[in-house]
Amino acid sequence: MIKLQKYSYLSHKYLILDTIEDCFSKKDLNFMHIPREEIGYIEFIRKDKIIIITYLHIYTSYRHKHYGYQVIDYLFSHYKFKCIVGETLKESRGFWNKCIRKYNGMRRNIYYSDNYTSLFVIPRQEISYKQIWDLLDYSYNIIY
């Protein structure tokens, strides 16, 4: 089970922590002082009930263990929003294509930065290109 912990000085950056709370009670965990493993980080902003993911990074030693899907599931279960919007890096196209299929999303052929190939919307929502462009512009102005 994973948890997101807010990074100390950035309001849009969260550490992804792996916990073992399924096996033990919180009282036992506090007694044992078992540290949570940091498996990566995610940067996202919420605006108008839409989550804009700017970066999701899982450390290489934790890849291929389905932590990316757990992060998306965590966002769905802990935040109230209509959809997730984000751009796709060339290296992570396979992961986001699987997420698009799994969560009934869609891909749009628009990108704000040269490093990215396209954009995704999970789950499928009717969003205009202008609204997507405004969301990406908003996120880049705040984060970068």
Which functions belong to the PLM regions below?
Residues 1-15, 138-144:
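Conserved N-terminal entry element of GNAT/NAT acetyltransferase domains
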Residues 49-60:
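Conserved acetyl-CoA binding element of GNAT-fold acetyltransferases
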Residues 58, 64-77:
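Conserved acetyl-CoA-binding loop-helix of GNAT-fold acetyltransferases
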Residues 36-41, 51:
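Glycine-rich phosphate/pyrophosphate-binding loop shared by adenosine-nucleotide-utilizing enzymes
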Residues 96, 100:
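Conserved active-site tyrosine of GNAT-family acetyltransferases
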Residues 3-6, 101-111:
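Short secondary-structure junctions
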Residues 109-144:
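C-terminal "cap" of GNAT-fold acetyltransferases
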Residues 77-90:
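Conserved GNAT acetyl-CoA-binding A-motif
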